[in-house]
């Protein structure tokens, strides 16, 4: 099994300050504990929240900071009490690497809502050391926060599912939209939004993409399989679509008015916020009162849901649309992501970047 009691060094790319620029960084991994697995990172997706983290947009970043929470790799070492994985398994690691295990959410297997959850980067682990993410050649993770990638699923395709995929799957599951026959809207067609379209279609929904421009109309309808496309500034079309949707998954990660989209919902419809926004959102109360509509939110998903989501995507043939880059391109990728210049998810080929050479 290797030397479990020896700390190992890892090489990643870290931000040092709110400029958000990443550069090579060597740091120490904790020793592989009894319930830990050491993972050699193969691929890691780039999420918009990584931008928030490295640029300290939320005012909580601690540097040096290695981002990356859509991690797929190979198990290279297991602790003595590990029962879920063996050396050689292809596995995934998402946004969480720990929780208290004792609170109400943990006992209900929705540990993403634990008040003592531990983020996979920009947090402090139980040993007092900072956690670092997947833009690195190796990680050590508690087996309870690792999932097995289904056999036959390409690792680079699996990476975005560990955040973008589960972030849309979980609200479908929780709010009862995991059956066919619903009419839904996906607001925003970025990395998360494109997974929303694909998963909703795989569940048998009629899907309308809502965007601020016509730029992605052809892509949405012809390649992603959406049924309709609405431009939010087209007043006539928006009025025609009023009261037509059971739900809207709002993926937009910047401030925007809500009333325009509330008008699209049927009675008892739900506007589900999943974009991380650091400015207040506003609406007038009659917009929800007069249709018994709800504005709610959802945050990633549980480990159990993540396993279900991976199996669902494998069964239905749901894949992510990605652009694979090497680590030395990461700063350019961050700039492009900030400008929405990606179709639809950057995935870093970490192993192919040969960080240790």
From Swiss-Prot:
Q: Which GO terms describe its molecular function?
A: cinnamyl-alcohol dehydrogenase activity; coniferyl-alcohol dehydrogenase activity; zinc ion binding
Which pathway is this protein engaged in? Aromatic compound metabolism; phenylpropanoid biosynthesis
Q: Which residues form a coiled coil?
A: none
The record lists Zn(2+) 2 as bound by: 100, 103, 106, 114
- Cofactor: binding comment: Binds 2 Zn(2+) ions per subunit.
Among Gene3D superfamilies, the record links this protein to: Medium-chain alcohol dehydrogenases, catalytic domain, NAD(P)-binding Rossmann-like Domain
**Annotated SMART domains:** PKS_ER (SM00829)
Q: Which domain of life is it from?
A: Eukaryota
GO BP: any one term: alkaloid metabolic process
Entry's EC annotation: 1.1.1.195
Disulfide-bonded cysteine pairs: these are none
| Upregulation | By fungal elicitor.
> What post-translational changes are documented for it?
The N-terminus is blocked.
Could you say which residues bind Zn(2+) 1 here? Answer: 47, 69-70, 163
Q: Which reactions does this protein catalyse?
A: (E)-cinnamyl alcohol + NADP(+) = (E)-cinnamaldehyde + NADPH + H(+); (E)-coniferol + NADP(+) = (E)-coniferaldehyde + NADPH + H(+); (E)-sinapyl alcohol + NADP(+) = (E)-sinapaldehyde + NADPH + H(+); (E)-4-coumaroyl alcohol + NADP(+) = (E)-4-coumaraldehyde + NADPH + H(+)
Q: What class of enzyme is it?
A: oxidoreductase
**Keyword annotations from UniProtKB, A to Z:** Lignin biosynthesis, Metal-binding, NADP, Oxidoreductase, Zinc
Q: What does this protein do?
A: Involved in lignin biosynthesis. Catalyzes the final step specific for the production of lignin monomers. Catalyzes the NADPH-dependent reduction of coniferaldehyde, 5-hydroxyconiferaldehyde, sinapaldehyde, 4-coumaraldehyde and caffeyl aldehyde to their respective alcohols.
Q: Which family does the record assign?
A: Belongs to the zinc-containing alcohol dehydrogenase family.
How it assembles, according to the record, is: Homodimer.
- The name this protein goes by in its record: Probable cinnamyl alcohol dehydrogenase 2
Q: Which organism's genome codes for this protein?
A: Nicotiana tabacum
